[in-house]
UniProtKB/Swiss-Prot annotation:
Gene (UniProt): hemH
Its biological purpose: Catalyzes the ferrous insertion into protoporphyrin IX.
Pfam families, sorted: Ferrochelatase
Similarity comment text for this entry: Belongs to the ferrochelatase family.
Protein name (database record): Ferrochelatase
EC number(s) from the headed UniProt entry: 4.98.1.1
SUPFAM superfamilies given in the database record: Chelatase (SSF53800)
Length: 320
């Protein structure tokens, strides 16, 4: 029997190549052109995207990226590369490639990299702990487009999500415990997930249920009372209703109600990025403190910590 050679494809969202309006515009154009992300009629969406959104948002978003940019690139790229390298070191006989849905390195370049290693089985791990059609679904779509152009197709194992994976929950819990030990236990632990339009959930996307699963399992692992843990949704875009409650509005309300100390974690982000380091760690900190809150800490993503890499290794092992 022929022995199978397996490769691993780590997939994430993507990032601009530079914190400049031009690079951000290229990235946003690709990102916001995906029907999995915005499913508005193209006749309505294209003029709005090209004539209004890209010209106005690109310079502003570029400044935000510049505020968190690291010496070796954007935080998401730096931490994603560290994850790839650490997982490859943990699994020395298994090729590990990194691909992004938008920007570089592309998912296609990652697939080609693995095929050049003569793998005949690819384990695809989208680094989105909670499934959503707008994230994991986009990886699935692009992978199908890539393989449709190949004469020979490798075996594919696709990990839908890992919202209640034991190692993932334990890694989150240990990160929370470390933050509590450093800063003191807060009045409230707020778990902020990236939002999606409410309509997507109404049409069958089980993302909110998967977020609730992670929240429930994490609270249980920490032994925290339900009233000490709150789940919210961030980063809404456009005018239609998104999943609620909204993170920024909740933080304002909590500050006004006299809640003094909050710690915030974003369990849906496998690596820190603009949304966590700028929106959550900075903007929403000001919202809470400005509303009367006294103390606010952001708990970093798992990034390339040894516990996170071990979780990834154990997760893909079941599919090899």
């Amino acid at each position: 029997m022929r022995q199978t050679k397996t490769g691993i494809l780590l997939a994430n969202l993507g990032t601009p190549d530079a914190p400049t309006p031009e690079a951000v515009k290229r990235y946003l154009k690709q990102f916001l052109s995906d029907r999995r992300v915005v499913d508005t009629s193209r006749l309505l969406w294209w003029p709005l995207l090209r004539g209004v959104i890209l010209p106005l948002r690109s310079p502003r978003v570029a400044k935000l990226y510049a505020s968190v940019w690291m010496e070796d690139g954007s935080p998401l790229m730096v931490y994603s590369r560290q994850q790839q390298q650490a997982l490859a070191q943990r699994l020395p006989d298994t090729p590990v490639a990194l691909g992004m849905s938008y920007g570089s390195p592309s998912l296609e370049s990652a697939v080609d990299e693995l095929l050049a290693e003569h793998v005949d089985h690819i384990v695809v791990l989208p680094l989105y702990p909670q499934f959503s059609c707008s994230t994991v679904g986009a990886v699935w779509d692009e992978l199908a487009r890539i393989l449709a152009r190949k004469r020979s197709i490798p075996g594919i194992s696709f990990i839908r999500d890992y919202a209640d994976n034991h190692d993932y929950i334990n890694a989150l819990a240990n990160s929370v415990r470390a933050s509590f030990a450093k800063h003191g236990e807060p009045d409230l632990l707020l778990l902020s997930y990236h939002g999606i339009p409410q309509r997507y959930a109404d049409e069958g996307d089980d993302y909110p249920q998967r977020c609730r699963t992670t929240t429930r399992e994490l609270a249980s692992a920490l032994g925290m009372a339900p009233e000490k843990v709150m789940m919210t949704f961030q980063s809404r875009f456009g005018r239609e209703p998104w999943l609620m409650p909204y993170t920024d509005e909740t933080l304002k309300m909590l500050g006004e109600k006299g809640v003094g100390h909050i710690q915030v974690m974003c369990p849906g982000f496998a690596a820190d990025c603009l949304e966590t380091l700028e929106e959550i760690a900075e903007q929403n900190r000001e919202v809470f403190l400005g509303a009367g809150g006294k103390k606010y800490e952001y708990i970093p993503a798992l990034n390339a910590t040894p516990e996170h890499i071990e979780m990834m290794a154990n997760l893909v092992a079941a599919y090899r």
